[in-house]
């Protein structure tokens, strides 16, 4: 019913323009940009893992994206199926790379102590403060639903692709997710509601609100709230053949 593109980094176009920052094309460029931001007195990232009983899940997305950028889809699948154990050195290397960002006080808004305690819904707010508390926020396509009210896509915020390592030859993998629904009873109202969700109208209503991507083939893509969200959708179709979700 719903899809999310996770390999995205959100930023403020004005903040980038004011500081002379360019969109990084590789992971090496991203890290160099982060170092430049620190040198300029800015904080590169807002990271929040808080989510009540599910606290920590945003870190799993970081880990998956890193694994896809350092190893083949086959290796990734072995990890997912547990054929490759979680203490495998390749997994540990990915974890340590994430740690080099999340556990770097200079890189993270509020310092590393704030990472686990900041709610993931509040974490991107630092993009919109004046002065900005952070320059970038890696999160999925749903996150604009939690941006400050009145924020305009393509003006107040935009995104770029979480880039691959230049040193690797793994294409441009895209991490994704989908929402599945299943009835828990056989009442007619339940069945009819699920049928309604299959209609283009139901999807287009959510598309107009922003923060929603649909896999429905027959929707009017002009119903998306902005060109920004159309751009998110393109990543689901233009991703390399080795895309994993």
Give residue spans per PLM region.
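Periplasmic solute-binding protein
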Residues: 1-23, 28-31, 42, 48-79, ...
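Short helices/loops that flank or line small-molecule/ion binding pockets
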Residues: 15-16, 34-40, 119-137
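Extracytoplasmic/periplasmic substrate-recognition and gating elements
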Residues: 18-19, 142, 148-214
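A local structural motif
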Residues: 19-22, 102-119, 133, 152-156
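Short helix-initiation/N-cap motifs at beta->coil->alpha
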Residues: 27-29, 112-126
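Glycine-centered hinge/linker elements that transmit conformational signals in sensory
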Residues: 34-36, 80-116, 162
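Short, solvent-exposed loop/beta-turn-alpha elements that line the ligand-binding surface or hinge
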Residues: 68-93, 149-151, 164-173
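Conserved small/polar residues in nucleotide/adenosyl-binding loops
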Residues: 235-243
